[in-house]
């Protein structure tokens, strides 16, 4: 098994060096996915996280749009052989569909 130096936000290693869910961070991951699925923008999500004094993956007080987008794009959250599931597949699919629609809209609008 290849050992990664850095693991995704929402996870930690246990004493056996296995990747496990880091409960506090996993709640933040769920919160981000749920807000985005319910039509909140990346900026609105950032403001909500700041309001709750939620440290970002880089331990900054403010969550940048890229950090939020990285969470929303990380397939590990739906589970794999090494990573336990944090987000169910229905929520994952809803978020990915919205992201695709947003990207399509931006490309279409900017092409006009």
What residues fall within each predicted segment?
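Conserved catalytic breakage-reunion loop centered on the nucleophilic residue
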Residues: 1-112
